[in-house]
A protein has these predicted regions:
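Intrinsic disorder/low-complexity segments enriched in polar/charged and small flexible residues
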Residues: 147, 186-187, 191, 205, ...
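Polar low-complexity intrinsically disordered regions enriched in Ser/Thr and small residues
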Residues: 22, 33, 139, 200, ...
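Short acidic (Asp/Glu) and glycine-rich catalytic loops that position anionic groups and cofactors
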Residues: 36-37, 142-147, 208-212
Length: 229
C-alpha cells in the first residue's frame, strides 16, 4: 500500500543500522573489545575507563561514516515524502503536518524549541561541567557526554535480579496482575540476547492470539531493567 512506500526510508535506515553496520574492534590495555550499536549505546559510552570511551566512540563513528551516503539518501527521501504528504493534505508546512498527528499546535512546538535553546542549554552546559569535575576530567569530549554522574546509579544487574525488580515494581497493581506478569519469566517471553543484526532498544511483538514477546539486547546494566519494565 501507499503507506509502505512513504515509510520505506525509515525501514531502510532501521535495517541498515541493525544488519549492515560493522564497527571495528578496539584494544585497551591488551584487551580486545567488540563494538556494535548495542554495546556502544548501552555500555561503552558511559564506561568508567576514559580510553574505552574514547576508542569505542572512534570505532562507532567510523562505522557510521561508512554508510553516511546511504543514510543521507534515506533521510532525504523521508523529508521529501513528508513534504509531499503535507502538501497533499493541505497543511501550511511539514511541521504543521507532523504536529497534527500529536494534536500539538505550532506555537507550542516553537515555544519548546526556544526553551531548549535559551533556558535549558545553559543548564545542560553547567551539568556537563559538573559531570567532568565529579569524574576528574580536565576536558570533556563528545565521547564523555553520556558518562554517569554516579556509576552506582547504573550498576551491573543479573537477569534473575531484573525479574525480581520487575515483580516488586508491579506488586501495587494486585495479585492478579502480578500473576499475569510472572508468565513472561515462566514461559520465556523475553529475548535477551544481544545478537549481531539485532536492533538496539526494546520492542514488543504482538502475534495474533498469542501472548506478546519482548525483544531487547541485554547488557547487564540497571538501565536494561528500566527497558524491561
Amino acid at each position: 500500500n501507499l503507506g509502505e512506500v512513504f515509510y520505506r526510508p525509515q525501514d531502510i535506515y532501521t535495517k541498515m543500522r541493525a544488519g549492515d553496520f560493522e564497527m571495528a574492534d578496539f584494544e585497551v590495555n591488551g584487551k580486545t573489545y567488540k563494538n556494535s550499536f548495542v554495546t556502544y549505546e548501552n555500555f561503552y559510552q558511559n564506561h568508567e575507563d576514559a580510553e574505552v570511551r574514547e576508542k569505542s566512540f572512534r570505532s562507532f563513528s567510523e562505522g557510521l561514516r561508512k554508510h553516511q551516503n546511504t543514510a543521507a539518501a534515506a533521510y532525504l527521501a523521508q523529508v521529501k515524502s513528508e513534504k509531499l504528504l503535507a502538501d497533499m493534505k493541505g497543511y501550511d508546512s511539514v511541521f504543521d503536518y507532523l504536529l497534527a498527528e500529536q494534536e500539538v499546535d505550532r506555537a507550542m512546538f516553537d515555544r519548546q524549541i526556544d526553551l531548549i535553546m535559551k533556558d535549558f542549554a545553559p543548564v545542560a552546559q553547567r551539568y556537563l561541567k559538573h559531570v567532568a569535575k565529579v569524574n576528574g576530567l580536565e576536558k570533556m569530549t563528545f565521547a564523555d557526554w553520556k558518562l554517569d554522574l554516579d556509576s552506582a546509579l547504573n550498576p551491573q544487574v543479573t537477569i534473575d535480579d531484573a525479574y525480581d525488580l520487575v515483580m516488586k515494581s508491579v506488586e501495587p497493581l494486585g495479585q492478579e496482575y502480578c500473576q499475569e506478569v510472572a508468565r513472561y519469566q515462566e514461559e520465556r517471553w523475553v529475548d535477551f540476547a544481544a545478537n549481531s543484526g539485532k536492533d538496539s532498544g526494546g520492542y514488543a511483538a504482538d502475534p495474533y492470539r498469542v501472548h506478546p514477546y519482548v525483544l531487547m539486547s541485554w547488557t547487564g546494566r540497571l538501565s536494561d531493567v528500566y527497558t524491561l519494565i
